[in-house]
Amino acid sequence: MTTSNSKVKLQLVRSLIGTRESHRATVRGLGLDRINSVSELEDTPAVRGMINKVSYLVKVIG
């Protein structure tokens, strides 16, 4: 398990046009709204699952 203060940084690298509505909602839930926007979130299993769901749209920076 990860420590409580570890973070994961995400960047939206592909457009949401033509994607499923549930994937768009997941990207918004991750705090990303436009291409190249960056969000820093706690590294939890829930966030990891969201990243896995939209892995073709986002890039993990750190």
UniProtKB/Swiss-Prot annotation:
UniProt GO MF annotations: structural constituent of ribosome
BP GO terms, sorted: translation
One Pfam family recorded for the sequence: Ribosomal_L30
Domain of life: Bacteria
GO cellular component: cytosolic large ribosomal subunit
Alphabetical keyword list: Ribonucleoprotein, Ribosomal protein
Coiled coil segments of this chain: none
Family: Belongs to the universal ribosomal protein uL30 family.
Complexes and interactors: Part of the 50S ribosomal subunit.
PANTHER family, per database record: LARGE RIBOSOMAL SUBUNIT PROTEIN UL30M, MITOCHONDRIAL RIBOSOMAL PROTEIN L30
Name the UniProt record assigns to this protein: Large ribosomal subunit protein uL30
Species: Polynucleobacter necessarius subsp. necessarius (strain STIR1)
Native organism taxonomy: Bacteria, Pseudomonadati, Pseudomonadota, Betaproteobacteria, Burkholderiales
